Regions:
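Active-site segment of metal-dependent pyrophosphate-handling enzymes
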Residues: 64-104
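Nudix hydrolase/Nudix homology domain
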Residues: 35-36, 102-160
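Hydrophobic pocket-lining residues within nucleotide cofactor-binding pockets
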Residues: 45, 91, 120-123
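Conserved Nudix-box catalytic region and its N-terminal flanking loop in Nudix hydrolases
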Residues: 21-61, 160
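Short, well-ordered beta-strand micro-motif
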Residues: 19, 86-90, 116-119
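Residue-level preference for beta-strand/loop junctions
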Residues: 9-11, 36, 81-83
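Acidic, metal-coordinating catalytic segment for phosphate/diphosphate chemistry
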Residues: 1-16
Length: 160
């Protein structure tokens, strides 16, 4: 029997910011390789940077917002040695979110298309899955909201 050779591929760790204001979640509309989806601000952790610093930097770059870490929400360790960190982040009410940029994505058609505040029922089930992965259920109010749905799961945007 021939032994299978595995090649290690380095993938840097990522960090994301979960920002909630007035019951809405700060989301980004992204079109990447022809696929449109909604996600939270975040990206790769740079050398010498902590996961917390990365989450705040990404929030500033992508949404134009200065934030403060409230607490860590989740850490997911990957098979390739990388990790995904998520943090609940507070942003002052006097700041307006703007569609920023991703310095790693240059060109005339960047993937980040729009920054917007969305309620949970406005987010499709497939995009919501990533919010659960990032620990949204531990943010005040969201566990109760999901429980209030009972056995029904909504599928906003179905048929779009």
């Amino acid at each position: 029997m021939q032994e299978k050779e595995y090649k290690y591929v380095y993938k840097r760790s990522r960090s994301v910011a979960i920002v909630v204001r007035d019951g809405k979640i700060l989301m980004e509309r992204v079109v990447y390789f022809g696929r449109e989806f909604y996600t939270v601000p975040g990206g790769g952790i740079e050398e010498g940077e902590t996961p917390e610093q990365a989450a705040l930097r990404e929030l500033k770059e992508e949404c134009g917002l200065e934030g403060k870490i409230i607490r860590p929400l989740a850490v997911q360790y990957k098979y390739d040695g990388s990790a995904e960190y998520s943090f609940e982040v507070e942003v002052s009410e006097d700041q307006e979110a703007i569609t920023g940029y991703d310095p790693e994505e240059t060109g005339e058609n960047p993937p980040l298309k729009e920054v917007l505040w969305m309620s949970l029922d406005e987010i499709s089930e497939k995009d919501r899955a990533f919010l659960w992965f990032y620990g949204l259920l531990t943010v005040d109010g969201y566990f109760e909201e999901i429980k209030s749905w009972g056995g029904e799961i909504s599928y906003p945007g179905e048929g779009m």
